[in-house]
Amino acid sequence: MTDHSRLENYPLSPLQQGMLFHALSVPSSGVDMEQIIITIRERVDFSAFERAWKRVLERHPVLRSKFVWEGLDEPLQIVEKAVSFTPRYLEYHNLSPSELDERVEDYLKKDRVSDFRMTEAPLMRLAVFRSDQPEVKCVWTFHHILLDGRSFPLVLEEVFNLYDALRAGKDLTLPNARPYRDYIEWLRARDLS
């Protein structure tokens, strides 16, 4: 058994436990896979874009989390100190806007049923569709066990604030983010009272 005591770890919330159970019971269902389509209508500095995503992963432990359960009394989320994250660039040239949209739709269908390995972080991926069109489309896919509907817009806001700063050659200091661990500790304290 792997010793997880040296990495940050904590229990799952009840909702996360349900999602983990579902991911293990019904693989490739796509039920808890979130897909966000991002359209960028300007010339993109892909180096700055990648660095912005990597900075956000560094800032938010939950985005570096994996889940373990085998041989344990209860599942744990383990926060990796660092994770590898590189967008997948898909090149589509000589396509009309509608043909590019068809390629994105095809990708969405296949991507939705491409499971994450819950024991490997990060539980997210980014596909970047480059073409002759004056815009770039991206698909950010993540497992819902990481982020809820109120959290993911905040993550995207940080990505684009960092991207704008990096593209301008500036350093942006963001306010400290509250780690998900605090929520888990609050839940456990509430359950004990």
Question: Which residues does each predicted region cover?
Answer:
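Helicase-core coupling region on the C-terminal RecA-like lobe
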Residues: 92
